[in-house]
């Protein structure tokens, strides 16, 4: 089964290529923190030889509480992203929440992301597809992996085949998510690159009443399980002070653990992809 290769700059994203790290922070808390986080990701990924894309949100439009921090907004967010790109020369990915944002974001960011909660919103999907940008499609917590085919088709019929799929866990009762490892294989049958968002798979949605809880202590275990499935890359959030992060701190890796964390996953990715394919169907 041929696997499609999606290219951004010199980076090749494919299920049979070395893993790409889509890493950064959950939301742009400040310009200075974004620069700090990106600088550390660049240092670590360059040292380890891992292709890297910086990620962060300019607006968290789906927070549990109306009082929760959402981000700097579209205009200021794009200014911060532009500075990061100039300073570190890295590709950028961020999420889009409304159709009118798609073209604006695509002018700055190399990859635009369709949020999980919005992944069936046809007007948004089509607006994003028509930009021609690479789209990272998050699998909704309420969708089966085979249902992602419909979203891919919407994008393709709008003229865009620069697509990536991303697993971020499935609802399991209230305030809990689980990751079905068999789902990766189902999505890989569509031949597009598949990523694993380990950070958000550790969420406990609404687990702290007005915000999401999480299981940071298990991030390496779950990341290893995902990377063992021959994936195109890992989606990961880190923070210099997760306990005081403005969003999803309980799921975020401590920034000072990034190097040993990624070193283990790079070794695992190389090992898994060195094995010959065994047809078991």
UniProtKB/Swiss-Prot annotation:
Pathway stated in the Swiss-Prot or TrEMBL entry: Carbohydrate biosynthesis; 3-deoxy-D-manno-octulosonate biosynthesis; 3-deoxy-D-manno-octulosonate from D-ribulose 5-phosphate: step 2/3; Bacterial outer membrane biogenesis; lipopolysaccharide biosynthesis
Record-linked InterPro entries: Aldolase_TIM (IPR013785), DAHP1/KDSA (IPR006218), KDO8P_synthase (IPR006269)
Database matches in SUPFAM superfamilies: Aldolase (SSF51569)
Single GO MF annotation: 3-deoxy-8-phosphooctulonate synthase activity
GO biological process: one example: keto-3-deoxy-D-manno-octulosonic acid biosynthetic process
Gene Ontology CC: cytoplasm
Family assignment from sequence similarity: Belongs to the KdsA family.
Protein name per its UniProtKB record: 2-dehydro-3-deoxyphosphooctonate aldolase
Taxonomic source organism: Pseudomonas syringae pv. tomato (strain ATCC BAA-871 / DC3000)
């Amino acid at each position: 089964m041929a696997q499609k290769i999606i290219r951004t700059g010199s980076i090749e994203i494919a299920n049979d290529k070395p893993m790409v790290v889509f890493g950064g922070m959950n939301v742009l808390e400040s310009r200075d923190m974004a620069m700090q986080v990106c600088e550390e990701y660049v240092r670590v990924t360059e040292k380890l030889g891992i292709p890297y894309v910086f990620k962060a949100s300019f607006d968290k439009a789906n927070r549990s509480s109306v009082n929760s921090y959402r981000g700097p907004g579209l205009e200021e967010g794009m200014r911060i992203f532009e500075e990061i790109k100039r300073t570190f020369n890295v590709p950028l990915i961020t999420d889009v929440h409304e159709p009118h944002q798609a073209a604006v974001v695509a002018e700055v960011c190399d990859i635009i992301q369709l949020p999980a909660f919005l992944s069936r919103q046809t007007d948004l999907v089509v607006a994003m597809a028509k930009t021609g940008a690479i789209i990272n499609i998050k699998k909704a917590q309420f969708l089966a992996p085979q249902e992602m085919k419909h979203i891919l088709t919407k994008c393709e019929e709008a003229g865009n085949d620069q697509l990536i799929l991303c697993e971020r866990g499935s609802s399991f009762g209230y305030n809990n998510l689980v990751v079905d490892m068999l789902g990766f294989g189902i999505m890989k049958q569509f031949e597009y690159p598949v990523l694993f968002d380990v950070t958000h798979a550790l969420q406990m949605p609404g687990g702290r009443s007005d915000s999401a809880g999480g299981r940071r202590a298990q991030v390496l275990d779950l990341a290893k399980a995902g990377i063992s499935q021959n994936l195109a890359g890992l989606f990961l959030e880190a923070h210099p002070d997760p306990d005081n992060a403005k969003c999803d701190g309980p799921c975020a890796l401590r920034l000072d653990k990034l190097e040993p964390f990624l070193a283990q996953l790079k070794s695992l990715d190389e090992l898994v992809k060195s094995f010959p394919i065994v047809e078991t169907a």
